[in-house]
């Protein structure tokens, strides 16, 4: 089979739609999205008009797109490279009907030629990903656990530290404060710490966004101390982000915010909630285990 690989910064509208379909079909077959939410959002965005010769999508924040087609032009596989990260981070998908045919190898070869030092995510625990990683000399450097818990009626009432009140997010007003606290809370985190006001606004435009599920813990002067952003997609609740200003840590604020969000999701008649946590963040894993969360799956990051 002839494999034709193309590499570019932006995508036409029709190609972006084709890639979105490939990603959806891959997710349905594997039971896990092959690329992160961030990549899926980037595919729908356009770069600033003044730097584009023609309108393209996905030409944002250092995104690069690798596309493999057969001789007849059928889309077989796709990889996204985030060149804005240091080192660059890649995610890829091979269509379920075209696996074990060298498409993944072709994509990883192109990625390693483009970025000799590289991180690659595998989101689906596919043994083929491990084989491919070994073949190219990658090592596992990070593991992200997806943990799940049943939503029940006996989550205790949150106990707020003295001087703290809780309110919900106001679009158009609170983005800057959330981004500031998030950057401090996740200074150590390679993805979450980079969240910008534009990233928050992109999520506000998504169908799942609901300010009633976005809790802000503020002091007497309405200064933000921490937040819990929840998410509901396809009937599954998510502890999307819990961020606490380091100056406000240690007083039980993180736990109170987590409980406020869990009680909100329970009130929406949902049966289950999920979250992502770094496997080596033992303190957080322990907190979530005490709340009834157990590991459901893992995302693995390989480094070359």
Regions from the PLM with identified roles:
Residues 188-236, 246:
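Phosphate-binding active sites in nucleotide-utilizing proteins
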Residues 1-53, 159-193:
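Short amphipathic alpha-helix that is part of the acyltransferase structural core
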Residues 100-114, 135, 244-246, 250-267, ...:
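Conserved acetyl-CoA-binding loop-helix of GNAT-fold acetyltransferases
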Residues 95-97, 232, 245-247, 251, ...:
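Active-site acidic-Proline motif in GNAT/NAT acetyltransferases
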Residues 72-77, 141, 211, 222-226, ...:
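Glycine-rich acetyl-CoA-binding "A-motif" of GNAT/NAT acetyltransferases
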Residues 135-155, 259-263, 268-304:
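Active-site/acyl-donor-binding loops of N-acyltransferases
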Residues 8-13, 23-115, 119, 225-237:
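Conserved donor-binding loop and adjoining core beta-sheet/short helix segment
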Residues 83-91, 95-164, 300-304:
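Acyl-donor-binding surface of acyltransferase catalytic domains
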